[in-house]
Amino acid sequence: MQTKATAQEFSVITSRLSFALVSFGILLAAQLGAHAADPVAELASFSVFNNVDLAQLANADVKPMRGPAMNNARFQSVQTCWVSPGAPAQVASALRSFNPARHSELKVLLHTNGSNFSQLGSLPNNGPVEWLQNATAQKSNELQLSKEEAAKTAPFAQFWSGVLTARASAGVFGQPPYSNSSNSIRPGDEINSLLSEQPRIKKQFGGIIGSKGEQYWELLDVDNKGVLTLGSSFNKGMQIADVLYYASGGYYAAVTLYQLWPVDVGGKASTLVWRGDLLSSGELADLHGVERLGAESALIKDVAKSVRAFRSDSGSR
């Protein structure tokens, strides 16, 4: 059933989106004194959380909420917040060191910082990789490539190394369109549209996303299909943006935003964390009624699962 496949795709995407953070932390110290005196009020000013209780958040399981409705049928959003022990710099350090590939349930088969794609020649021998190899050899229309990329012929590792190298060099907003879509989807346009659909969030995080940031690439298991992705992480004060700007399948683009505030809970230095997930997927556009609701519920559950994995690893829960 289509909803099941879509839910599994979202599970991998949100797991990765949670914590692809590379350089954040030192800048926090300079921002603490100047930041808003009332984190709860600031949180309410741009999010779906109108009045949170910090003590309850510190002791409760994470409970993501559906974000405001968006006009584009391809788009979906989820927000969540929680309290972690320690100052923002400590929480940021834990985010940087979190490795989703260590959690088999998150289905991140490979994560590599930077833009060296030599590991494409020694990928694991499993079902998702075999699917990707066959799809590449057969020029499957399930692969999201430009017309120029699709026309190239080369061995698997060489082919994908060329595609990923060129796209990584182009940066977030320089991506060529996916030719397997009748709408000629450009990932950079999707990212801008996702943010424009959430004006309060766009205002809160204005200027944080640049061209390249701290780059990484991954191999994901999406419904037993291998998917190669490119992403970049950006930071600005106590804000983080993690942008997935290329995927060989499964979704068009995705953005995860984080805001961190220093708070005191029970006399202990803590950090209030807000996270917002914005996702564009062709699968979503085809879902209606019960199937659409099922996909939304699946995304909420998967965001919760990925946050729980981080909190468990970092000792936050």
Label for each model-derived stretch:
Residues 32-36:
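Sec/Tat signal peptide C-region and signal peptidase I cleavage site
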Residues 3-21:
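Bacterial N-terminal signal peptides that target proteins for export
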Residues 18-31:
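Bacterial N-terminal signal peptides
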Residues 37-317:
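Eukaryotic helix-grip
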